[in-house]
Regions:
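C-terminal alpha-helical cap/extension of soluble enzyme domains
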Residues: 6-14, 31, 35-37, 196-199, ...
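Active-site beta->alpha loop and helix N-cap motifs at the rims of alpha/beta catalytic domains
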Residues: 2-9, 13-141, 150
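Glycine-rich phosphate-binding "P-loop"
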Residues: 135, 157, 267-268
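Alpha-helix N-capping/helix-start residues
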Residues: 17, 22, 54, 146, ...
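Catalytic alpha/beta core domains of metabolic enzymes, predominantly
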Residues: 125-126, 139-244
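Alpha-helical structural signal in soluble globular domains
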Residues: 59, 63-68, 92, 96, ...
């Protein structure tokens, strides 16, 4: 079962000084859908879920599901560093209308590969929604090895992996062992290389800013037009370097504020982008648009 093909946006959570900025969130959701993305991912890394209360998360899920109104799938981050909490959140967000769940590997608790299989088995068997495994070892300290995903892909409801290890060799092995499950790049700069090897698309940070471009690029790759897709990837890559010159989502929120799409407000310990790096990002955006 494929939840989407091509581009899903790892959506930011816009904040005001007093909480979640729902006016901006609604505009961002419409902006994404009107520019042809295949799905929305909320409460992920880019969405600053780690700094949000459970009540805020519940309200964001309810709002996003209603705002999307069935136009695209809404995929909700429901991971935790302990299995019991991840099961509870996955059930909760499923009951609120999530179309699928993005479940990051347990963080801080550095489990073994067999622990990963047990963890995802508990979660996937507790819900009736598709589950996407989220592998981002630079943040979690745990890496889902390709052979482990081969086992995970056989679990009922585990339908995909967001592979953000930044390693094309590992990604190629994961794709080879994934069976019927989808592999999505979690690294914007590796989208087209991954899709050339059989990945189904990307869960993208850059699409917050340029959703139509990323969507068009992934559609070209899906259609086998790799020359066009590669040309677009090479045009995008300098901008991607700027968008990750500081910890995500610091640069993307700066850029979205520059275009009037949301305020440049982050929650501690994240702080706003340095002037030196924001000046460089301004130039990269101008170059991309020229």
């Amino acid at each position: 079962m494929s939840i989407f093909k091509g581009c899903a946006t790892a959506l930011v959570t816009p904040f005001s000084d007093s909480g979640v900025d729902y006016d901006s969130l609604g505009r961002l959701i419409d902006f994404q859908i009107e520019n042809d993305v295949g799905a929305l991912v909320i409460l992920g890394t880019t969405g600053e879920a780690a700094t949000m209360s459970e009540d805020e998360k519940i309200d964001v899920v309810k709002f996003s599901v209603k705002a999307a109104d069935g136009r695209v799938p809404v995929i909700v981050g429901s991971g935790s560093n302990d299995t019991k909490s991840a099961v509870r959140l996955s059930r909760l967000f499923s009951s609120l209308g999530a179309d699928a769940l993005l479940v990051v590997t347990p963080f801080y608790n550095k489990c073994t590969q067999s622990g990963l299989v047990a963890h995802y088995s508990e979660i996937a068997n507790s819900v009736d929604k598709p589950v996407i495994v989220y592998n981002v070892p630079a943040r979690t300290g745990v890496n889902v090895l390709p052979e482990t995903f081969r086992k995970l892909a056989k679990i009922k409801n585990v339908v995909a992996i967001k592979e953000a290890a930044g390693d094309l060799s590992q990604m190629s092995d994961t794709i080879m062992l994934s069976g019927d499950a989808d592999v999505f790049s979690g690294d914007d700069n590796l989208t087209v290389p991954a899709m050339c090897m059989g990945a189904s698309g990307v869960i993208s940070v850059a699409a917050n800013l340029f959703p139509k471009f990323v969507s068009t690029m992934t559609k070209a790759a899906l259609l086998g037009n790799y020359d066009k897709a590669a040309t677009m990837q090479l045009k995008l890559n300098p901008l991607i370097h700027g968008l990750f010159s500081e910890v995500n989502p610091i640069p993307i929120k700066y850029a979205l504020n520059k275009f009037g799409l949301c305020k440049n407000i982050l929650r501690l310990p994240l702080t706003t982008m340095s002037k030196a790096n924001s000046d460089k990002l301004d130039v990269l955006i101008d170059d991309f648009l020229s």
